[in-house]
């Protein structure tokens, strides 16, 4: 098996780190800029059954290349994200001559820098939220939980390494997938759980399953906290060979057709037919189904959320563009029976959406104190 085929995606890593969580929130284009494909391999040493000693960065991995606020960005993290996002952009647009100085290449460089910075800020935004809420990110308890998560990943019989510490150590010292970077990601995952606990204790998350679920159900049914939608989705580059302009044109045709239908029921039937016919509306590409999507602020991308809230019931949007693709959205009325039957899931999503909003705000603050990485990106791409 090739080295490339051995790599885990960042989403797979987070699934492993968080697999005991009951988090069911779906993020389309927020935070993560949705989400988006990052590959990652984990390196560590298991010195004892219950104690895992970190693997030190190599000299090359440990070079500081910049800062985001107080957080030093090391060469391993920067180089890894540069490589992953460069591949994503070239998968989207085709092979790029990064030194040709064209307007197209400048646009791609800007997009690449934005993606890299967003990727770097994702974990540090969690640390900032911790500081704002009095959580010690470096406490013995947190470090113990991080060790447990990493050990769980290492010992996974279905994973790549299956407890082979030598294999972990060797891989963590090659390239840019260092143990230190993995620990940052694992710590962020652990801390998100702690932040949710703190928000519930403080009342910032006002509804708690064990205390006031009935009140939450009433709130969800009678307020505009939750919005229900369905949509047609066309990806930009998740399917090999997709022509972006062709996809945009197809989505625009659907949007225009829906807007030409005056009857609500006929329009609803039409979007469902469009969803069923769209080759990309498989479970891997869309969340749209007969129940629709129930979301509150912080769960979806900002563009998606604001567009949906501006629609009347059974109204449809123009084509909206996000990092991952094109959407045509229809707003649907809330189904109170659905809310009652799925209240626990909606409450869990509501709680995580509160955290997502805090992280979104922390990212905005970090962006204002972020170093300019454009020169370094260009240098690495053209050397």
Region roles according to the model:
Residues 18-26, 72, 80, 248-259, ...:
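Solvent-exposed loop/turn and edge beta-strand elements of beta-rich ligand-binding domains
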Residues 82-89, 120, 124, 128-137, ...:
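Sec/Tat-exported extracytoplasmic proteins
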Residues 76, 107-124, 136-140, 181-190, ...:
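Soluble non-cytosolic domains of exported or imported proteins
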Residues 54-177:
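N-terminal targeting/tethering segments
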Residues 2-32, 41-60, 168-246, 298-383:
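PPIase-associated folding chaperone regions across multiple families
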Residues 253-303, 333:
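Peptidyl-prolyl cis-trans isomerase
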Residues 156, 289, 322:
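Acidic surface patches and DE-rich sequence motifs
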